[in-house]
């Protein structure tokens, strides 16, 4: 038995110019508020205005910005789990300096989102890269609601940050009190089995404990030491399988999940990962490279009351399937105003499916105007190329690995020299006299 589950979690992803299907609301996600006419300040200042202005939509899992003028859907999707800081910024008069990243630190403006030349600044990290996004409204109507938006953004971010237990596996946390698990809101205990062993991936001997199956997660804890415990939310499970014990006919019930920093003893060796199978389940490997995989194996040989492992695996499987079909992410904030959830992450000028023009909607074009069909095609091509080549690198502000020059102090050959192509936003191994991938082509 081995069941693989889709792991489409937009709150964990940071996507730039994502395909249309990545901007569709996932199960359990709902739109909270939307504002039109928002400028992406860090976009290339040479591109058309229709590419720099768009719609901001805030959901319970992410903040999405969608260009109103790009036929291929220039967009930004920032998962709330990737955000490290939210602040109020100060726009420079010289936009070229602003895009280059030369900025002044300004104290927050008493919770106001925008006043005059103020903007909202999002700092985020994803795949060991630091990103910075800056959004500024262009309409008077948006500015009048600035305080409302910033307060909602802060409230959603805090609510998401304080409900991690719904979405993230925790080890050795405060989830047990006086021999009983501390339940979440709306959580119900379905079954409880004693004397089930937890096996570590590095071969630590079994530790017997209580295996609790609830409506939201699996909880295991040791009665002798309640601080030794595990909480596994169903929405965070990558796979569920039965694994044979060497030298025995018995099997282990194994959960595979994305690892956190405090799970070193449960990390799986790379050669045991079935990466092709994981990628096959709808998410197509999005964000998978940023995950280490941890495995939690449970031994039911001494379970009280006795239960066949196949029966336990089937009941857990049903709970996971039900929870992932209708996930509860824990964030409870009512939507502000009327938001059409069918197209919540798409601007009002675009349809939810193909990012085309909705029936009955008049599209006002900006930039070069022409009456010829060929001219219109050229304009669309320019917009599409600009969004794919100029935007992504503009948001990267720091890196803990490849981008930039990495040289040894003594110029030794033990380290690679990496160069970041500013146009494509791709890091590559450089040679003397080469500053871009285009230069490599000329060779």
Swiss-Prot record:
GO biological process, alphabetically ordered: cilium assembly; intracellular transport
GO MF, one annotated term: phosphatidylinositol-3-phosphate binding
Gene Ontology cellular component list: 9+2 motile cilium; axoneme; BBSome; ciliary basal body
Keywords linked to the UniProt accession: Cell projection, Cilium, Cytoplasm, Cytoskeleton, Flagellum
Keyword Cytoplasm: yes
Tagged with keyword Nucleotide-binding: no
SUPFAM superfamilies: PH domain-like
Predominant place of localization: cytoplasm
InterPro entries linked: BBL5, BBS5_PH
UniProt-annotated location(s): Cytoplasm, Cytoskeleton, Flagellum axoneme
Similarity section: Belongs to the BBS5 family.
Name recorded for this polypeptide: BBSome complex member BBS5 homolog
Originating species: Giardia intestinalis (strain ATCC 50803 / WB clone C6) (Giardia lamblia)
Lineage: Eukaryota, Metamonada, Diplomonadida, Hexamitidae, Giardiinae
